[in-house]
From Swiss-Prot:
It comes from Pyrobaculum aerophilum (strain ATCC 51768 / DSM 7523 / JCM 9630 / CIP 104966 / NBRC 100827 / IM2). Possesses an unusual extended V-shaped dimeric structure with each monomer consisting of three distinct domains arranged along a curved 'spinal' alpha-helix. The N-terminal catalytic domain specifically recognizes the glutamate moiety of the substrate. The second domain is the NADPH-binding domain, and the third C-terminal domain is responsible for dimerization. This is Glutamyl-tRNA reductase. Catalyzes the NADPH-dependent reduction of glutamyl-tRNA(Glu) to glutamate 1-semialdehyde (GSA). Keywords: NADP, Oxidoreductase, Porphyrin biosynthesis. Belongs to the glutamyl-tRNA reductase family. It catalyses: (S)-4-amino-5-oxopentanoate + tRNA(Glu) + NADP(+) = L-glutamyl-tRNA(Glu) + NADPH + H(+). NADP(+) binds at residues 177-182. PROSITE patterns: GLUTR.
């Protein structure tokens, strides 16, 4: 049984379209997960460099419903399946598919999306295990190679870019957004010793939490506060996710010299009377650092392949655990029914105890089979047990 075969990934990245397009496609994906995610396990990753949807056990019709969200970019999207879909996710988490090879930001973004979608009930079952293992692979790559030495991500690159234009130690700086990218920006700017640091976020409590750690000032992310920052700050970094421009004008008398737009889609309007640095401006700098990391990338790829090779057995074990749990749950339901039918208060407890004593030895054997590498055989046994529904209700026959 190939438990990776039901996995499919629909992929659109910075290699095919620009960041602004990715942002708008990402919004379509959000609608899709709200519709399809309640039916099938699904994981959507939306960053400034990619929009990807991973589905498990989805029909062709359901996969097509996802690709329709990309219909204007039909020639650019890729649909990969099975082990290749898993390999791609592992490589993404490891930073091997990023504009800046080895960036750490992407791993934080994968974790953030994963936590959010698990809580929402969208990423579950074996797909949950696949994403967990991808995150594990990404962490192992960072721990065992030097692929992430230097800039952590595009946010770090943007700081390097700006530092070549002015002295950050003499600059007042604002960061709009306190997500994974915004928090990383704020931390690095504080470490560089900017003259004054402001952190703005829609949820003020999160901005306060980060600001307190960094000696910064927290403000709510409102139009008024953004305009105030333009009046007070030399540099403003925007890492906000918004369908509307967060900065659409620069007020008279503003002192801001540089605005960095890391938002997807773009959060800074074109044509402003100030220098605006966008993701496309960082490409050359990203290529420079990526070239320096290529030797470490080879080691990272070896780790990814090693972790990927473990995945089929891990999924088979997880499949058994889920199946046995389902089997035990159903058996307990029957036991309770039989106990209640007996009309004795202790009968329910006795019935449940009997089920446990009967099934637990079988469960232990299945676990031992899994530990001994006989996962395929264990899966077959579970399938046989699950198909014998009449055995669970002999008293009704």
């Amino acid at each position: 049984m190939d438990l990776l075969a039901p996995l499919a990934a629909v992929i659109l990245t910075y290699r095919e379209v620009d960041a602004d397009t990715l942002g708008r496609v990402g919004e379509e994906m959000k609608k899709c997960i709200e519709i399809l995610g309640v039916k099938r396990p699904m994981f959507v990753l939306h960053t400034c460099g990619r929009v990807e949807a991973y589905l498990y056990n989805a029909s062709e019709e359901e996969i097509n419903s996802v690709t329709l969200r990309y219909r204007r970019y039909a020639e650019s999207i890729r649909v990969v399946r099975g082990v290749e879909a898993a390999r791609h996710l592992f490589r993404v988490a490891a930073g091997l598919e990023s504009m800046l090879i080895g960036e750490t930001d992407i791993l934080g973004q994968v974790e953030e999306a994963f936590d959010r979608q698990v809580k929402a009930g969208f990423t579950k079952g074996l797909l949950k295990t696949i994403v967990e293992r991808a995150i594990r692979a990404g962490k192992r790559v960072r721990a065992e190679t030097g692929i992430s030495r230097g800039p952590a991500g595009l946010g770090s690159l943007s700081i390097i870019y700006v530092s070549q234009l002015l002295d950050l130690t003499k600059s007042k700086v604002a960061v709009l957004g306190a997500g994974a990218v915004g928090a990383g920006l704020a931390k690095e700017l504080a470490e560089r010793g900017v003259a004054k640091l402001y952190i703005l976020n829609r949820t003020l409590e999160k901005a306060v939490e980060i600001a307190n750690k960094l000696g910064a000032e927290a403000r709510p992310l409102t139009r008024e506060e953004v305009q105030k920052c333009l009046m007070e700050c030399d540099v403003v970094f925007s890492s906000v996710h918004s369908l509307e421009y967060v900065i659409d004008r620069v007020p008279d008398g503003a002192v801001v010299k540089i605005i960095v737009d890391l938002g997807v889609p773009q959060t800074v309007a074109p044509g402003l009377p100030v220098r605006v640095v966008r993701l496309s401006d960082l490409k050359q700098l990203a290529e420079k650092y990526s070239e320096a990391r290529k030797q470490e990338a080879a080691r990272a790829e070896a780790i990814v392949e090693e972790e990927l090779a473990k995945l089929p057995q891990i999924l088979a074990r997880r499949y058994i655990e889920e199946a046995v749990s389902h089997l035990l749950e159903k058996a307990m339901e029957v036991a309770e029914e039989e106990g209640k039918r007996a009309g004795c208060p202790t009968a329910v407890l006795a019935a449940r105890t009997t089920v446990k004593r009967t099934l637990f030895p079988i469960i232990e054997v299945l676990k031992k089979m899994a530990e001994d590498g006989r996962l395929e055989d264990a899966v077959k046994v579970v399938e046989i047990l699950r198909s014998q529904k009449p055995l669970l209700r002999q008293s009704e026959e």
